[in-house]
Swiss-Prot record:
Family: Belongs to the cytochrome P450 family.
Protein's UniProt name: Cytochrome P450 2C50
Main subcellular localisation: endoplasmic reticulum
InterPro entries: Cyt_P450, Cyt_P450_CS, Cyt_P450_E_grp-I, Cyt_P450_sf, Cytochrome_P450_fam2
Length: 490
C-alpha cells in the first residue's frame, strides 16, 4: 500500500478517535464550546485578556462550563455562587492543585503552593503551625512589620523628594519581613544581592503574565523543545532556590535543636517527621522549595499591591486626602501606626480593600483540581479534572459592587461611613487553598501604606487625569504599568 495513503489513513483515524473521546467526555462534563482536536478551544480565548474571554463564554454556557485547553478538559467556575459552592461547600473535593506546567516543572510537585495530596496537607499544616509559633497573628509579628515600616520610611526619605520608581523599594519591605521569618535576617535596601533577588522575582511575575506563558501552560511540550522566556523563569527560580539552599546549609551547621530561631530551624528539627516519605536529600529539596514558595508569595503579591495602591492614590488625590485626614485624626504625626488603629479608620480600611478588589491581582487564582469523582450542579466532574475559578468575576460583580470598573472606596462603606465587609471580597481566594499568608499581607498593607501617607505627600509627574492605571499585562497576575513619583516629606 502507498505509504502516503497509510499516513493519511492513520491521521484520519487519530483525528476521529480524538473527536470521539472529546465527545464522550463532553457528555458528562458541564456544557461548553465544541473543541478542535489537539488545540481544543484555544482559538476562542484571547490570551491577552483571558478574564474577558471567560466572561463572554459564561454568558453563553452559564456559570459552570467546560473548556478544552489543548486536549485536557478544564471546568471554569464564574461568579460568586459557583466559586463559593465549589471551594467552600465542597472544599475537600476541590482542594487539589491543578496543573500549571511551568511551575510543576520548576517545583517537581514539592513545596506548599504546587504540591498535592498528603504532601500538600502535611506541608501546609506544618507551615501554618510554625508560622503561628513564630508570631503570625500575634504582637511579635506586628512589631517586625512596624520596624520594617520605619525602615521603609527612612529609605523613602533618602529620595529627597526626587522622582523615583518605587518598584524595588516597595518590594524590599515585605521581602525583609518574610526573610526575618524564614531565616531570621533582613537586608539593607541597597544590598546588591537583595536587589538582584527582587529583580528576579519581579521578572518571573511579568513573564508568567505574558501570552506566551499562557500558551506554554496549555501546550507543555513547548517547555522542553522551544526557546523562549519560559527558560528565564526556570533560571530565575533556580537562582532564588539556590540562594535559599545556601541559607539552609548555614542553618544546618549552626542548628541548636533546643532553640529554633526561624522557619528553617523548625523544619530541620520537626519537618522531617511531617515529610517522612522523602529521603534526606529530597527533604532538603522540599524545604528549599517550600521556603521559595513562602519567599515568593510573601514578597511579590504584597509589593505589587503596594505599587498599584500608590498609582491609584496618585490618580485619585481626593481619596489620598481623605486617608491622610483620617491618619491625622486617629494616629497623628508622631506615633507609629498599629493594627488597633484599623478599626478606628474605616475609610483607610475601605481604601485598601478597594485597591485589592479593583486591581484584581490574580484574576483566575491558581488552578484547582478535583480530588475525586464529584457530581456538581448535576454535572459529573471526574477525578483529576482541572478547575479554574474566576476571582475576577466575583470581585467585579456589579450587584455587589455597583460600577465595578470604577475605583471607589465607597464599595466597602455603609450609609453611615462605617466599614462594610463583603463575602465577595476574595483576592486571596477562599476555601482550603486560601493563601496561608493572608493575615500577614493584610497587616503589611495597612501598616506600610499608613506609614507612607503619614510621612509623605505623593506627587505625580503628570496630571492625575493623564495617569493610566490599566494593567501592563493580565495573565497569571495583573501587572501595573511602570511609573515614577515623588515622596514629598509632609
Amino acid at each position: 500500500m502507498d505509504p502516503i495513503l497509510v499516513l493519511v489513513f492513520t491521521l484520519s483515524c487519530l483525528f476521529l478517535l480524538s473527536l470521539w473521546r472529546q465527545s464522550s467526555e463532553r457528555g458528562k462534563l458541564p456544557p461548553g464550546p465544541t473543541p478542535l482536536p489537539i488545540i481544543g478551544n484555544i482559538l476562542q480565548i484571547n490570551v491577552k485578556d483571558i478574564c474577558q474571554s471567560f466572561t463572554n463564554l459564561s454568558k453563553v454556557y452559564g456559570p459552570v462550563y467546560t473548556l478544552y485547553l489543548g486536549r485536557k478538559p478544564t471546568v471554569v467556575l464564574h461568579g460568586y455562587e459557583a466559586v463559593k459552592e465549589a471551594l467552600v461547600d465542597h472544599g475537600e473535593e476541590f482542594a487539589g492543585r491543578g496543573r500549571l506546567p511551568v511551575f510543576d516543572k520548576a517545583t517537581n510537585g514539592m513545596g506548599i503552593i504546587f504540591s498535592k495530596g498528603n504532601v500538600w496537607k502535611n506541608t501546609r499544616r506544618f507551615s501554618l503551625t510554625t508560622l503561628r509559633n513564630l508570631g503570625m497573628g500575634k504582637r511579635s509579628i506586628e512589631d517586625r512589620v512596624q520596624e520594617e515600616a520605619r525602615c521603609l520610611v527612612e529609605e523613602l526619605r533618602k529620595t529627597n523628594g526626587s522622582p523615583c520608581d518605587p518598584t524595588f523599594i516597595l518590594g524590599c519591605a515585605p521581602c525583609n519581613v518574610i526573610c526575618s521569618i524564614i531565616f531570621q535576617d533582613r537586608f539593607d535596601y541597597k544590598d546588591r544581592d537583595f536587589l538582584n533577588l527582587m529583580e528576579k522575582l519581579n521578572e518571573i511575575t511579568k513573564i508568567m503574565s505574558t501570552p506566551w506563558l499562557q500558551v506554554c501552560n496549555t501546550f507543555p511540550v513547548l517547555l522542553d523543545y522551544c526557546p523562549g522566556s519560559h527558560n528565564k523563569v526556570f533560571k530565575n527560580y533556580a537562582c532564588i532556590k539556590n540562594f535559599l539552599l545556601e541559607k539552609i546549609k548555614e542553618h544546618e551547621e549552626s542548628l541548636d535543636v533546643t532553640i529554633p530561631r526561624d522557619f528553617i530551624d523548625y523544619f530541620l528539627i520537626n519537618g522531617g517527621q511531617e515529610n517522612g516519605n522523602y529521603p534526606l536529600k529530597n527533604r532538603l529539596e522540599h524545604l528549599a522549595i517550600t521556603v521559595t514558595d513562602l519567599f515568593s508569595a510573601g514578597t511579590e503579591t504584597t509589593s505589587t499591591t503596594l505599587r498599584y495602591a500608590l498609582l491609584l492614590l496618585l490618580k485619585y488625590p481626593h481619596v489620598t486626602a481623605k486617608v491622610q485626614e483620617e491618619i491625622e485624626h486617629v494616629i497623628g504625626k508622631h506615633r507609629r501606626p498599629c493594627m488597633q488603629d484599623r478599626s478606628h479608620m474605616p475609610y483607610t480600611d475601605a481604601m485598601i480593600h478597594e485597591v485589592q478588589r479593583f486591581i484584581d491581582l490574580v484574576p483566575n487564582s491558581l488552578p484547582h483540581e478535583v480530588t475525586c469523582d464529584i457530581k456538581f450542579r448535576n454535572y459529573f466532574i471526574p477525578k483529576g479534572t482541572n478547575v479554574i475559578t474566576s476571582l475576577s468575576s466575583v470581585l467585579r460583580d456589579s450587584k455587589e459592587f455597583p460600577n465595578p470598573e470604577k475605583f471607589d472606596p465607597g464599595h466597602f462603606l455603609d450609609e453611615n461611613g462605617k466599614f462594610k465587609k463583603s463575602d465577595y471580597f476574595m483576592p486571596f481566594s477562599t476555601g482550603k487553598r486560601i493563601c496561608a499568608g493572608e493575615g500577614l499581607a493584610r497587616m503589611e498593607l495597612f501598616l506600610f501604606l499608613t506609614s507612607i501617607l503619614q510621612n509623605f505627600n505623593l506627587k505625580p509627574l503628570v496630571h492625575p487625569k493623564d495617569i493610566d492605571v490599566t494593567p501592563m499585562l493580565i495573565g497569571l497576575a495583573s501587572v501595573p504599568p511602570a511609573f515614577q513619583l515623588c515622596f514629598i516629606p509632609s
